[in-house]
Amino acid sequence: MANSPQAKKRIRRNDRRAEVNTARMSRIRSFVKKVETAVAEGDKKAAEAALKEAQPEMARGVARGVIHKNTAARKFSRLTKRVASL
């Protein structure tokens, strides 16, 4: 258990940051899911539109330290390849 005031504050801050990061990751997953759903349905226009929305969302996740840049690049590359194959 944290005893010092600083350690208690760090716990509070960590909890707040974890909540924000969880929300950001959830948002990224939702955008990626939209692309995957459109690809599964074979709707190229919807897939391209969803991909255009998902890319900046992943970039924001990278900028804010939620996901690693290589992870975002890999996900975007794979999504792009799947959309292009339609």
UniProtKB/Swiss-Prot annotation:
Establish whether keyword rRNA-binding is in the entry.
Answer: yes
Q: From which domain of life does this come?
A: Bacteria
Q: Which GO BP terms, alphabetically?
A: translation
Keywords assigned? Ribonucleoprotein, Ribosomal protein, RNA-binding, rRNA-binding
Q: Which regions form coiled coils?
A: none
Q: Which GO terms describe its cellular component?
A: small ribosomal subunit
- Record-linked Pfam families: Ribosomal_S20p (PF01649)
Outline what the protein does.
Answer: Binds directly to 16S ribosomal RNA.
HAMAP family (alphabetical): Ribosomal_bS20
- Name of the protein this chain belongs to: Small ribosomal subunit protein bS20
Source species: Erythrobacter litoralis (strain HTCC2594)
